[in-house]
C-alpha cells in the first residue's frame, strides 16, 4: 500500500496520483497543504523537511518527496515497457521528454500563468499582462505541437511517463480563462488523455477553491 500526503487540488499531487492510477497501485491519500494545513507539523517535517507536498511512503520504505523523483521511483519499481522500458535507450528518450516537461512546461505555466489568473479577481484580470508569460509558454507548446505531429504521444507511439509529466497540466491549461492559440495536435492529444479513466479521476479536479476569495 502506498500512502500519499497531499491535497487533490495540488498539480504536483495530481501528477503522482495519475501515475499511481495508471499503474493500478493500491493507495491511501491524506489531505494536507493549503486549507488543510499540516505541513509545518513536526511529524510531517520529519518526513519532508521542506514542508511541501506530495510525500509518499511505499509500505515501510523511506518517505519520498519531489514529484519528479516520486514518478521515477514508481516507474522503476512498478512500470513496464512501453510505459517505462528496461532498455536504457528508450527509457532515456522518455526521461528526456519528462524532464523537458517539468522544466519548460510546468515552471512556465503554473506560477506565471495559472496562479496569476487564479489569484486575481475576475473583474481585475488583464489578458495583456499575461502576454509575456504566454509567449514563453507558447514557444515550448509549439515544440510539443511539432513532436505530436510525428506520433500520438509525447515520446512516440505509446503512452509513457513523459505523458504523465507533460499532460497533467493540460486540464488546467485548457480550462483556465486565458486566450489560447489553436494547436490542433495538442488539442487532439489532450482529448486522448481525457479518454483515460485515471486522468479523469486524478487530474480533472475542479480548482475553484484555489481562487482568491474562495471559502
Where are these regions (language model features)?
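Short beta-strand(s) of the beta-wing in winged-helix/HTH DNA-binding folds
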Residues: 54-57, 154, 200
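GST-like fold's C-terminal all-alpha helical module
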Residues: 98-195
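Terminal-tail/helix-coil boundary detector
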Residues: 199, 203-215
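Active-site-flanking alpha-helical
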Residues: 75, 169-170, 203
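Short Asp/Glu-rich motifs
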Residues: 38-40, 192, 212-213
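GST-like domain detector, emphasizing the conserved glutathione-binding G-site
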Residues: 1-9, 14-131
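Conserved beta-strand edge residues that scaffold enzyme active sites
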Residues: 34-35, 162, 207
Amino acid at each position: 500500500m502506498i500512502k500519499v500526503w497531499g491535497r487533490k487540488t495540488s498539480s504536483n499531487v495530481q501528477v503522482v496520483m495519475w501515475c499511481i492510477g495508471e499503474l493500478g497501485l493500491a493507495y491511501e491519500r491524506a489531505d494536507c497543504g493549503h486549507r488543510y494545513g499540516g505541513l509545518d507539523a513536526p511529524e510531517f517535517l520529519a518526513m519532508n523537511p521542506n514542508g511541501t507536498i506530495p510525500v509518499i511512503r511505499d509500505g515501510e520504505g523511506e518517505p519520498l518527496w519531489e514529484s519528479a523523483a516520486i514518478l521515477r521511483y514508481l516507474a522503476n519499481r512498478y512500470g513496464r515497457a512501453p510505459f517505462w522500458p528496461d532498455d536504457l535507450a528508450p527509457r532515456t528518450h522518455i526521461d528526456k521528454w519528462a524532464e523537458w516537461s517539468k522544466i519548460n512546461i510546468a515552471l512556465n505555466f503554473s506560477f506565471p500563468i495559472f496562479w496569476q489568473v487564479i489569484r486575481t479577481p475576475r473583474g481585475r484580470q488583464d489578458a495583456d499582462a499575461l502576454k509575456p508569460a504566454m509567449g514563453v509558454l507558447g514557444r515550448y507548446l509549439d515544440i510539443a505541437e511539432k513532436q505530436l505531429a510525428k506520433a500520438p504521444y509525447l515520446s512516440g507511439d505509446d503512452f509513457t511517463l513523459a505523458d504523465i509529466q507533460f499532460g497533467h497540466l493540460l486540464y488546467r491549461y485548457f480550462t483556465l480563462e486565458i486566450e489560447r492559440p489553436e494547436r490542433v495536435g495538442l488539442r487532439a492529444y489532450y482529448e486522448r488523455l481525457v479518454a483515460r479513466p485515471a486522468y479523469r479521476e486524478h487530474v480533472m479536479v475542479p480548482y475553484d477553491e484555489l481562487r482568491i476569495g474562495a471559502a
